[in-house]
Amino acid sequence: MAGQVLDGKACAQQFRSNIANEIKSIQGHVPGFAPNLAIIQVGNRPDSATYVRMKRKAAEEAGIVANFIHLDESATEFEVLRYVDQLNEDPHTHGIIVQLPLPAHLDEDRITSRVLAEKDVDGFGPTNIGELNKKNGHPFFLPCTPKGIIELLHKANVTIEGSRSVVIGRSDIVGSPVAELLKSLNSTVTITHSKTRDIASYLHDADIVVVAIGQPEFVKGEWFKPRDGTSSDKKTVVIDVGTNYVADPSKKSGFKCVGDVEFNEAIKYVHLITPVPGGVGPMTVAMLMQNTLIAAKRQMEESSKPLQIPPLPLKLLTPVPSDIDISRAQQPKLINQLAQELGIYSHELELYGHYKAKISPKVIERLQTRQNGKYILVSGITPTPLGEGKSTTTMGLVQALTAHLGKPAIANVRQPSLGPTLGVKGGAAGGGYSQVIPMDEFNLHLTGDIHAIGAANNLLAAAIDTRMFHETTQKNDATFYNRLVPRKNGKRKFTPSMQRRLNRLGIQKTNPDDLTPEEINKFARLNIDPDTITIKRVVDINDRMLRQITIGQAPTEKNHTRVTGFDITVASELMAILALSKDLRDMKERIGRVVVAADVNRSPVTVEDVGCTGALTALLRDAIKPNLMQTLEGTPVLVHAGPFANISIGASSVIADRVALKLVGTEPEAKTEAGYVVTEAGFDFTMGGERFFNIKCRSSGLTPNAVVLVATVRALKSHGGAPDVKPGQPLPSAYTEENIEFVEKGAANMCKQIANIKQFGVPVVVAINKFETDTEGEIAAIRKAALEAGAFEAVTSNHWAEGGKGAIDLAKAVIEASNQPVDFHFLYDVNSSVEDKLTTIVQKMYGGAAIDILPEAQRKIDMYKEQGFGNLPICIAKTQYSLSHDATLKGVPTGFTFPIRDVRLSNGAGYLYALAAEIQTIPGLATYAGYMAVEVDDDGEIDGLF
């Protein structure tokens, strides 16, 4: 009786059906799950085209997306590798297969080896083959044909363990890997090949024979005859891998397909045998589909796992060394390693040296299905001029969360300006054992974002003054128009910005030659009133001599002079736009909306009118990408944007927050806990915190889960009647000796800040930032007052001296607070009047009785209302050293009238800002300035900066 046919076609069909069902099942709870196989074919070989069609058809049946990339025969190796690299980096591509053979001019090994092992679903890359050949190896994928052979044997209930197997053929594609698989399943394996003498002698006692020698009917049927010549006790299972075409005049094609085994004879003597075609071939394709599914599931599972961010150990010293000494004593992680720990792909990362990099905002799109992590705002009580340690607390908190409690956490902070760094303020990287490293790179230039803001701002300023010059010196409309819209190669064309201006003016024309004289005048003349220009040039250095200058004094400017001045770069509205934009499109639209002046008819003139929107966006294209750095304990920090806290929101960017919240977020069905994003707002909560909620949260659509309010014994003593604290002078003894009475009186300021936070419906944790001279009695007084005022918790934190270890209790309190319900609401309705919004902030946040709007401020308010800008949120610029407008009023002043001296528009950023006093928007340098101590040694190490 003849043996039986082992039908690979039917088995493959069952596998494809099972794969399709499993995909549908997963999609039931993960709708976005879509296994994707990329197939690269170079050239037009008919056999390759046939195999590709088979794979695409099988993918369709299995519910797998097949992305077919067909390259011309002449494609260079560089081009093919570029496609492979793109697919390697594409998170939507789970498997990659390069159809072989490739044209002769291409190196197959180099190209196939370029495929990432995690996407090498063919299983033949060096990593997967290498792991397969190790005794305890762990390949990502088994090669498809050998895997299909094993599955066929299992399907036929063939016992592999303890069997004797003979493999005829030693190729890297089938022979060698199938031998390894059989061996790993405890079969005793003999490998033979075309040069082996008397192959038939090896087959008599074989239980399993795999033939992959590539020669038509090389193995004769009679080789399987039992030694005694009978046909009894047939036990051999034959797997024929061969695919050979031999002449057959009876076929229409003139050829027929045969295997490496003489099928018609062998079936007489064996138990099972695979046919050709219809045996191993369909199983190979089915295993390709199964490997693709495995890859997609593995990626899904990896994305659902909590982030693992191994900490860097700290060697704590007493007394605590200087910040720069601590920074240099710690060897940071390579930034690409930290990015990998965060789940950032290499194509989403742009390295700037070893320890800083930019992150593509496209991370947000890739992780769009994730639920955001927990969002924590760090703010403070009304500070002394020495500061109370918000940045240090931010770093200590994330170090505690990640390095000591195993919770993924990212700190999001502003980029410091060079001006204060080289002036009197020093760096802004935190301090002690809670800081960003390398701190010199953090404080100097970083990746050049501030310089990009400066270039963009100054281009705009130059464009405004130059436009006024050209309009004034060219009186004839037609002549001016011809120069504004010149002919190139005999044709005139509006730029995109010009076309947008035409549309806003209601001129629905696209051909420059079609405009009437009236339309030409309306379009070409901006008629800027020079007295209304709000844009100043900027520089990122403290330079008091630039506060007021006269431009246009060169003879070439024909007496077109104008008094103007410089701002520090971070005071530019473009910096606020960078901080508040949700994405590149939003940034471009905001830039276009910036009002630079009014025309002679009091109508607003925008960046879009000047024609600068595209150019400014181009200059800021890279600046919109957040910068990745790390803390002393190797936890991630995103550094992005640095709007001037005096007249702007004083917070890092919306984009950085959105990126970070997705990176530490969780997939909808994941059972892991979300991580934490800890950001901060400038000055005290009454200023930075209020702006954060009413301006930044309106722009981002995000709301914090908790607020950390930083308080110090020193600051509360200042508000409780202790002598003033002055920078550069020794602290009065009241601050270094126990004085609980001062603390208890000053605690009223903290309690007012707690009440202010609670008006937004968010839980608040008070962080008592510990100093060496603080006593237990003073700290206990603060905690008691905080809890009585409604704080969720009040915790002492010693992160400056101990790093994350010193902030563990604070981190635990923040975790608990962030799990409390939030009843968030804004302080005011943006659609209420400007006057009402100002009054609400002054009364509810500052404790004032009323506002006093000076005539010039009222004139501007009326103008902004007339121009349609009355429904914007409000930013109030005032002193940071008092809840009121008067820095000498400590504690919790009440009943005062708050002056509004001026109101200005930041339409691109999306707010009005009112000034309670004259604010210097470019600082000066002191007699002794920070830059005087800076030196650089022969190795490039910077000394004296901090």
From Swiss-Prot:
Reactions catalysed: (6R)-5,10-methylene-5,6,7,8-tetrahydrofolate + NADP(+) = (6R)-5,10-methenyltetrahydrofolate + NADPH; (6R)-5,10-methenyltetrahydrofolate + H2O = (6R)-10-formyltetrahydrofolate + H(+); (6S)-5,6,7,8-tetrahydrofolate + formate + ATP = (6R)-10-formyltetrahydrofolate + ADP + phosphate
Cellular component annotations (GO), alphabetically ordered: cytoplasm; cytosol; nucleus
Annotated disulfide bonds: none
Pathway where it operates: One-carbon metabolism; tetrahydrofolate interconversion
Stretch list, region Methylenetetrahydrofolate dehydrogenase and cyclohydrolase: 2-319
Record annotation: effect of changing residue 11 to S: Almost no effect on activity
InterPro entries: Aminoacid_DH-like_N_sf, Formate_THF_ligase, Formate_THF_ligase_CS, NAD(P)-bd_dom_sf, P-loop_NTPase, THF_DH/CycHdrlase, THF_DH/CycHdrlase_cat_dom, THF_DH/CycHdrlase_CS
Binding site for NADP(+): 169-171, 194
Similarity-based family: In the N-terminal section; belongs to the tetrahydrofolate dehydrogenase/cyclohydrolase family. In the C-terminal section; belongs to the formate--tetrahydrofolate ligase family.
Name of the protein described by the UniProt record: C-1-tetrahydrofolate synthase, cytoplasmic
Source organism of the structure: Saccharomyces cerevisiae (strain ATCC 204508 / S288c) (Baker's yeast)
